[in-house]
Amino acid sequence: MEIKRDAYLEQLKIKKDNGMIKIITGIRRCGKSFLLFVLFKKYLLESGVDNDHIIEIALDGIENEELRDPKKCYQHIKERVEDDQKYYLLLDEVQFMSRFEEVLNSLLRISNIDVYVTGSNSKFLSSDIATEFRGRGDEIRIYPLSFAEFYAAFDGDYDDAWEEYMIYGGLPQVLQFSVERQKAEYLKNIFTNVYIKDVVERNKLRNVDEIDTLVDILASAIGAPTNPTKISNTFKSERGINYSNKTISNHIDYLVEAFLISKADRYDIKGRKYVGANLKYYFSDVGLRNARLNFRQQEPTHIMENIVYNELLIRGYNVDVGIVEAYAKNDEGKTTRKQFEVDFVVNQGSQRYYIQVAYDMTSEEKQKQEFNSFRNIPDSFKKIVVVNGTKKPWRNEEGFVIMGMKYFLLNADSLEF
């Protein structure tokens, strides 16, 4: 089974021979190596590039352990370049090499090498590295399979695919297993033995239990506003552990750098400013989140919200969570100031969308809850509610768009309805 990653492959084609280092980033096992060594290499060969002019090095493999030494790697690449024709270097998991930025900068000075690297940690895209590359690094962010990519490779109908995706997520390897137990064991195993191990080793953490518990807390609270103080209090009350705010904040940063989670800032829509406290955290793959909790906490609304968030990132949007303050009457008829939440404030260029995610909108109370946030937003940008199911999009009398998850996920331009 060959899974298509057409959008990412197209980016590589466009950026080919542009004189910059193409840096492919994303969580481990999301398909970066497959994109580079299979799909892009196939494209190069079909374009007439000779096989001996494609240099492939996977630094996470034991067979290339020696090449993790920067000088040896640079020398090896130099020796492979035997003529003046264009060579294509495909370098996988570059963070395994110390001082890799020096090697890449040296390769930039060789005019007939076009360089492509992958990495599973965002630290190597820090401002220091960007300065080292002097504006000659070109990032392509890769995500686990979108639902559209998953569905295209899935052997079954939409309902079965959606159920699978909500439980086991979109890591490509999951599609290779036919037995549910295998999928679950695979996800639980790589979470502990790949992702957590990487975070612990890369950041030289001594207390593995702390990071383990932190991940469990974040997995239990996807879509819920939180902050280091709240998490610290949870550690004290439930575990009897003193875990400082600063340490928690650092550990969350490590998880973000490893692409395991993303954080969504809170934006005050009326005040037009960011609110520092109570961010929301989402997992880069819901299957990993579910595996971390042993598939116990199956909360469809929060899982749907996580999937919508990831889909928006895949489409290239900037995504925040919104709050809007307004005056409203309470149950006693008194007017009080109330804070309404908007699941996502979505921006791209001059475009903005407000999005609510609801598993069920059949009750009048639920409709009121979702629509009241929109009613208090003082602008005319599009307001969309994404609901579970296959409902085709329609616009109600207030101008709000309601669309089913199927339409949202399978139509790349669904926000333009």
Predicted regions and their residues:
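A cross-kingdom feature that marks ATP-driven nucleic-acid transaction machinery
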Residues: E2, G19, T25, F34, ...
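Pre-Walker A adenine-sensing motif
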Residues: E2-G19
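Conserved glycine(s) of the Walker
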Residues: G31
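Short glycine-rich substrate-engagement loop in P-loop NTPases that contacts/grips substrate
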Residues: I55-D84
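Structural recognition of the conserved hydrophobic beta-strand(s) that form the central parallel beta-sheet
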Residues: D114-S120, R141
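Short regulatory helix/loop adjacent to the ATP-binding pocket of P-loop NTPases
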Residues: K123-D138, A153-D155
